[in-house]
Amino acid sequence: MHPRRPEGFDGLGYRGGVRDDPAFGGPFHARSFGSGTELGHWVTTPPDIPGSRNLHWGEKSPSYGVPSAPPTLEGPAEEPFPGGGDGPRPGRSSEQLNRFAGFGIGLASLFTENVLAHPCIVLRRQCQVNYHARHYHLTPFSVINIMYSFNKTQGPRALWKGMGSTFIVQGVTLGAEGIISEFTPLPREVSQKWNPKQIGEHLLLKCLTYMVAMPFYSASLIETVQSEIIRDNTGILECVKEGIGRVIGLGVPHSKRLLPLFSLIFPTVLHGVLHYIISSIIQKIVLLILKRKTCSSHLAESTSPMQNMLDAYFPELIANFAASLCSDVILYPLETVLHRLHIQGTRTIIDNTDLGYEVLPINTQYEGMRDCVNTIKQEEGVFGFYKGFGAVIIQYTLHATILQITKIIYSTLLQNSI
């Protein structure tokens, strides 16, 4: 379980550009976790719009209370305005264009990850929990066909159900992590000069966060796989209500096959932590490769300002894309097991992913994670762990296409402005 947003940004940090008021934040001091040096940004948790502030390679967000130094500019030095006025500065319009362009690029990426990809997530989860299915939908062609059938028989809402609850789960996860880190010495970030103790404390924070968000994740999963045919018009906060009811034992009655929350802790935390570790490692590797490639190309030949701006925005987006793709593919079998354990005993009715119409009940009787793995292997084969994998292919193909289109549009705007 994890936030759909890959965690690699600086949250409220600010990169590039000069603060108009260098004294801002003076009375506040950054928290330190055993070191007075500035923490390097290996991984960060708060979500941010990628590309909106990382204007140049190697720059970091200034710490609170430390005035940011003006960036080094190529070409002749600009004379400051007399009296420190806020009059128009040379190159200010270009700088604002870069910021708004970066904001737009990041917004397009977030929109693709959380909105356009949601139908793929819905169908992927329905296929994962459907142990009745004879068609595994391992290719995107069969997935597109079943999507069309659902849309024809139930309307567009069949593919967009539960989207609000996914945002709630992300908010609960980030909020829980922030609160726990504020009241405990567990760090939200890991410095470049890390040590095993710091890594362990950071991963412990992640484990506690996933445990807190687990009941809400379970409620969100039910909303995304519940058939629209028998679905009631529930409010957007129904996920919160069901999550709290799952903890205190109230709410909609469940069957005796419902697994207790403590038996779901291990698979949920295992999936979340592994997803986080794999994403972080892949992201750092891809960023390092792209950075070296960019530096070597800059040394080999002089690059245009347009290329410099593209190199400032897109490597981080590409790294996040690759990290999310690799972690989803590697952990797909574990995610299938996790979703079946969460959905068991909740009396959920799902759509028939073989026919595109009719509904099916979920009547599994897994005793735990090991029993679920063995049962899937015996009754459905190895490919039973990959049911609905074609939806992942569609999801990331769509994401890559949106990134490429955004890059083309941004390059065109830069060519017209230079």
UniProtKB/Swiss-Prot annotation:
The keyword Phosphoprotein applies. The modification Phosphothreonine is found at T45. It comes from the Eukaryota. Residues 46-96 are annotated as: Disordered. PROSITE patterns: SOLCAR. GO terms for molecular function: protein-containing complex binding. GO terms for cellular component: mitochondrial outer membrane; mitochondrion. Keywords: Membrane, Mitochondrion, Mitochondrion outer membrane, Phosphoprotein, Repeat, Transmembrane, Transmembrane helix, Transport. Solcar repeats lie at residues 96-187, 311-416. Associates with the mitochondrial contact site and cristae organizing system (MICOS) complex. May associate with the endoplasmic reticulum membrane protein complex (EMC). This is Mitochondrial outer membrane protein SLC25A46. It comes from Rattus norvegicus. The lineage of its organism: Eukaryota, Metazoa, Chordata, Craniata, Vertebrata.
